[in-house]
Amino acid sequence: MSTILKASAASFALLSLGHTISGREWTSDKVFKNIKGSRSWACGTVGWYQGSAFLFISGILHYQWSRDPSLLQDPLNKAIAAIINVLLWVSSSWYVKNGVTPSAVACGFSAALQGFAVLKEIL
C-alpha cells in the first residue's frame, strides 16, 4: 500500500468537502440569487456540485491506486492521473487570478501532493 497515494486520496476527499461548502457559500450570495431560475444559475449550480462529485471520485480512484500502485503502470491510469493533475493546477491558477486564495492554495497543495505521489510510483 502506498501511504503517499493514500494521503493524496484523503486530500481529494477534503477538496470535495471544501468545494461543496464553498458552493453553498457563493450560491447564497445576493448577486447569484438575483439570477435564480436562469440558465446561468442552473448550469453554475449543477456544474459546481458535479465538480464536488468529480473530486470525490478522484479520491476513490487515488485510494484504489494506493492499494495497488502497479495500476499506475497502465497508460490509461497514467493519462487519468496527468489530466487530474493538470486540472488541479489550472484550477489553482484560475483561483489566484480571481482572488480566491483559499481555493488556490488548496488546489495547488493537492496538485503538488498528487503529482509527487503519482511520479513516485511510476518512476
Where are the predicted features?
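Interfacial segments of alpha-helical transmembrane regions
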Residues: 1-13
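Core segments of alpha-helical transmembrane spans in multipass integral membrane proteins
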Residues: 14-26, 39-67, 82-86
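Juxtamembrane transmembrane-helix termini
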Residues: 22-32, 64-71, 98-101, 120-123
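Perimembrane loop-to-helix junctions flanking transmembrane segments
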Residues: 32-40
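Well-ordered alpha-helical segments within folded domains of soluble proteins
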Residues: 57-59, 104-109
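Portal/gating segments that form or line small-molecule/metal binding sites
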Residues: 61, 65-98
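Membrane-helix boundary connector in multi-pass membrane proteins
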Residues: 87-106, 116-123
